[in-house]
Design a protein with these regions (language model features):
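Conserved beta-strand-loop surface patch within small alpha/beta domains used
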Residues: 1-62, 71-106
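...with weaker cross-activation on analogous glycine-rich loops/strands in unrelated enzymes
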Residues: 147-173
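A short glycine-/small-residue-rich loop at the edge of a beta-strand within enzyme catalytic domains
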Residues: 43, 116-120, 124, 153
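Active-site nucleophilic cysteine motif
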Residues: 118-136
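Short acidic alpha-helical/loop segments enriched in Asp/Glu that coordinate divalent cations
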Residues: 138-149
Length: 173
């Protein structure tokens, strides 16, 4: 069996939640490495457990990310495309009920400044600011790692301190 068979079985098992995994080269062969989805809303998004990512890296070379869209088409969302660019890895999306696959490779995609769907950590307020400065002013701003959920961010809102570290200064009126 090829790795897609295992990934599809994983997606069917966890339906209606999104599943996630990695394609890893182990002893010259592509293998599917299932990962835990640690997202707070696993029916809508996925976040690969960092310990699973580390374990996969220990086994071999990670060449792709796999996740499922159990209730929508396997076409990548705007947030999926942005995240794919950030990882610089090939992505595969499977729709488990239809057994349909879509493959996507990084190609320089950037979400539009107007009309992007808000997704925490991918297309959120900071990414909009960062992308605006890059596209309109040619200024590259740091991309900050976010907590895994917006609720966790509310407990520790670090963007106020991040603005200063990014180079912004408060001006006197």
């Amino acid at each position: 069996m090829n790795w897609k068979t295992y990934a599809l079985a994983h997606a069917k098992l966890d339906d209606p939640n999104e599943t996630c995994g990695l394609v890893v080269i182990i002893k010259g062969k592509e293998k599917y490495f299932s990962c835990k989805n640690i997202a707070d809303q696993p029916k809508d998004i996925f976040i690969i457990d960092p310990s699973d990512w580390a374990a996969a890296e220990d086994c071999g070379e990670i060449t792709a990310i796999v996740h499922s869209h159990p209730t929508t088409s396997p076409q990548l969302s705007m947030a999926d495309k942005v995240a794919c660019e950030k990882t610089k890895l090939k992505w595969y999306v499977v729709q488990p009920n239809l057994e349909q696959w879509v493959e996507y490779e990084p190609c320089g995609y950037r979400a539009p400044l107007i009309g992007r769907k808000w997704v925490w950590g991918v297309n959120d307020c900071w990414s909009l600011c960062r992308d605006y400065y890059q596209e309109e002013l040619g200024i590259t701003l740091r991309d900050w790692d976010r907590p895994t959920s917006s609720d966790a961010f509310l407990l520790n809102p670090f963007f106020d301190s991040s603005f200063h570290a990014t180079g912004f200064r408060e001006l006197e009126p």
